[in-house]
Amino acid sequence: MSVSQAVRNPRGYLVRTLEMYRALLFDPEHFYDEYLGSRGLRSEILMVAFVGVVGLVGNYFARQEVQSVFVEAAIPINSDTNFELIRLVIAPIVGIFILWIGLTIALYAVSWLYSTIGQFYELMKRSAWAVVPLVVANLLHSIAIGYAATQVTEDQVDPQNVPQPPIDRAHHMWDTAAGEIYVTATILVGAVFVIWAGYIAAYAVRDVRDLETSEALRVAAVPAGLYAIWVLYQGVSAFL
């Protein structure tokens, strides 16, 4: 449905959009057969960017809140510290694009064990939609870290415990919010959505490589399983 049709019939556009995402999440086979367009990657790039921005919003708010507390506590924040804080803020949007590309490469490489047909470009277009479940993980983390940042007070800032090296100082500041147990819990919960993304990715690679569904599931289980293990490791490490 075009933009002009959406303007003329917003209700119909909304219904079709909801049906499309329901199919993607719960019936990816139908989604790829019915809804995936044949044009360029514009829609996919925008969609992946949106998933990253959802995570970035909470990080940006947390940085503003935490930095203001440390400034009030007379803790110097130089350009190197500020740069590292910015890097932490934009990590979700940079990371989601790296994840998309990495997922595509992994699916293409592992599926080579079963088939050599299919174009990398087509797989990249399809695998972009597999990251959609991660928008929920990013949303939960954004809400959690945003709330945690509002709870940081000047009384919690001990100048004696603030590291001197700029990068260490940035991480110390960040951890005053990111280190809260409920923020860490959202990282662990994120592993569930990684597995969900892997399920969708199986159908992304299936038709491109002309695989059996069982073969596609085994292919997708490799990158999804490894990434889920890494996410769990990150979450558990934060608890320790």
Residue ranges and their predicted role:
Residues 122-234:
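Hydrophobic alpha-helical transmembrane segments and adjacent short intramembrane/lumenal linkers
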Residues 1-58, 77-79:
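N-terminal juxtamembrane cytosolic/stromal segments of multi-pass membrane proteins
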Residues 60-77, 154:
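Interfacial/capping segments of alpha-helical transmembrane domains
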